Design a protein with these regions (language model features):
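Hydrophobic alpha-helical transmembrane segments
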Residues: 1-183, 195-325
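Substrate/ligand-engaging "lid" and interaction regions
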Residues: 188
Length: 325
């Protein structure tokens, strides 16, 4: 177990699991830190600045985009690694407190669920209000969406971002500590800002954002499937759920993304509803259109996934500690 022994954060299950639980608790109680102190905002600022330096020709755009991504990812990884090295030399309680303050901004479960609930509240007031609120959450055109489609989009966003904002950062944290979580969050932020095909914000991102999109695909591959499994397990056991398990792979591959379809399909099957993007894909097409109660049920499923993930993380920390000793 020489390799494990070389990873200092696996030596103490208490530090690893304590940091995870405390970060989730602070997220639950307080939500996001102010933007000027938010590391994900800093990442976004760097990516926004870098985007202005990317040339237009495809080959140059790809090379410059890849270089800018690698520089940013390398900087955040090594800064996080050095911070973690210093913090692990402190007493355990100080290490947990400090690591929590650094891990928490990389997790955004409270913000995600609040935004999704806000869409439902706005939709209860009017369709236009629901569309306007949804536009803050998704990048798709919301102008022509029906009430059901607005709700579908909000629930889809909850499922997809449950992976991006909670499961995947924790997955990489459990494997590589703070550097792993920071590295993933940078990659996911880059994909959210650059990972498009065609025009967006006056620029063709087909080549400029290709590296960012593929990197996120690789880093999200395992966590997305873990999210799907946890969503399915979090549903109520029944014969219908058994059939849903059999349909999961088929439904998950209906989306263009190799990863986002998994948590979205799992959410659709667990709720028994239809989710989709008009003209692009439909998940669990035989399901009923979601009503307001389905949004609340989706949030409950998300809560169960977060708690299950924290429990799995604690068990993983104990296993790491035993293997490293």
């Amino acid at each position: 177990m020489v390799v494990l022994s070389a990873l200092p954060w696996v030596a103490s299950a208490g530090v690893l699991s304590g940091t995870l639980w405390l970060a989730l608790a602070i997220d639950h109680w307080f939500g996001e830190p102010p933007p000027r102190w938010h590391p994900v905002v800093w990442m976004g600022n760097y990516l926004d600045w870098s985007a202005r330096c990317i040339p237009t020709p495809p080959l140059q755009a790809f090379a410059t985009g890849a270089l800018a991504w690698c520089v940013g990812a390398g900087v955040v990884f090594f800064v996080a690694m050095e911070l973690q090295r210093l913090l692990l030399e402190l007493p355990a309680w100080a290490t947990i407190a400090s690591m929590t303050l650094l891990l928490k901004p990389l997790l955004a479960w409270r913000m995600l669920r609040c935004e999704v609930v806000a869409v439902e509240v706005a939709l209860g007031a009017s369709l236009d209000a629901g569309r306007a609120r949804l536009a803050r959450l998704v990048s798709r055109d919301v102008a022509a969406l029906t009430e059901s489609e607005v709700r579908e989009s909000a629930i889809e966003s909850l499922a997809e971002n449950l992976n991006d904002s909670v499961v995947a950062p924790i997955f990489w944290f459990m494997l590589f500590g703070l550097p792993g979580a920071v590295f993933y969050r940078f990659a996911n932020t880059a994909d959210a800002m650059w990972g498009y095909r065609g025009m967006r914000g006056g620029r063709d991102w087909t080549w400029a954002g290709k590296w960012a999109a593929r990197a996120d695909d690789v880093l999200s591959w395992v966590p997305a499937r873990i999210t799907a499994v946890l969503l399915m397990v979090s549903g109520r056991p029944s014969l219908a759920m058994l059939r849903a398990w059999c349909a999961l792979r088929r439904e998950a591959t209906r989306t263009p993304s190799p990863n986002s379809g998994w948590p979205m399909a799992a959410m659709a099957l667990s709720l028994g509803v239809r989710l989709g993007k008009p003209g692009v894909y439909a998940l669990n097409a035989a399901g009923r259109p979601p009503v307001a109660a389905e949004t609340a049920r989706a949030v409950v499923l998300g809560h169960r996934v977060v708690l299950a993930l924290a429990a799995i993380g604690t068990a993983t920390a104990l296993s790491w500690s035993r293997l490293a000793s």
